[in-house]
């Protein structure tokens, strides 16, 4: 009853009224065969941007989304994350999985401090040789390329840290760097937090 139906028309010589009907529910999607599990540590932006981030991260196959309370996160945005938004976020995940056909069951964890986020990553992950952690940074000093960081062939888990609208503070970058997160910078672009 709730199944989305899509009508596709076959474009070939023959009967013009031949068609295929397709419908997918998130529960019907087969588990991911990907050998890499992705985590997104997102510093808390405005609520509307967080919804867009959750949708796009789910469509891309992110396994865990961890909202991080950072120095540049505005207090009202943090409060919005901790309030009744959880049900809305779960609905967004379900809809994004249906739309994209993503086989990854995305989980949104509770908002945590930066120290808690680092501890979570270190506790939940494997040996250093089997994981990689990057932080997208708008400054280009002492950064590496994505290829340099992710070129190891035995990586099983990847953490991606993204700042809020104000970015990530220098002290937070230092804390992340000291704990194995490698700052990366795209030479030609500074991306918005929701991109």
Predicted segment positions?
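N-terminal positively charged helical leader segments and presequences
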Residues: 1-29
């Amino acid at each position: 009853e709730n199944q989305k139906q899509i009508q596709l028309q076959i474009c070939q010589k023959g009967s013009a009224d031949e068609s295929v009907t397709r419908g997918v529910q998130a529960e019907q999607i087969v588990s991911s065969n990907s050998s890499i599990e992705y985590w997104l540590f997102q510093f808390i932006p405005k609520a509307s941007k967080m919804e867009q981030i959750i949708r796009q991260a789910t469509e891309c196959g992110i396994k865990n989304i961890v909202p991080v309370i950072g120095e540049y996160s505005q207090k009202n945005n943090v409060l919005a994350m901790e309030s009744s938004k959880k049900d809305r976020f779960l609905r967004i995940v379900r809809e994004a999985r249906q739309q994209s056909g993503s086989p990854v069951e995305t989980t949104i964890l509770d908002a945590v401090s930066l120290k808690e986020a680092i501890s979570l990553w270190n506790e939940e992950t494997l040996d250093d040789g089997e994981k990689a952690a990057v932080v997208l940074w708008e400054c280009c000093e002492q950064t590496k390329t994505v290829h340099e960081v992710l070129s190891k062939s035995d990586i099983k888990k990847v953490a991606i840290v993204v700042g809020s609208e104000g970015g990530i503070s220098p002290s937070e970058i230092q804390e992340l760097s000291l704990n194995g997160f490698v700052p990366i910078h795209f030479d030609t672009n500074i991306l918005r937090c929701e991109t």
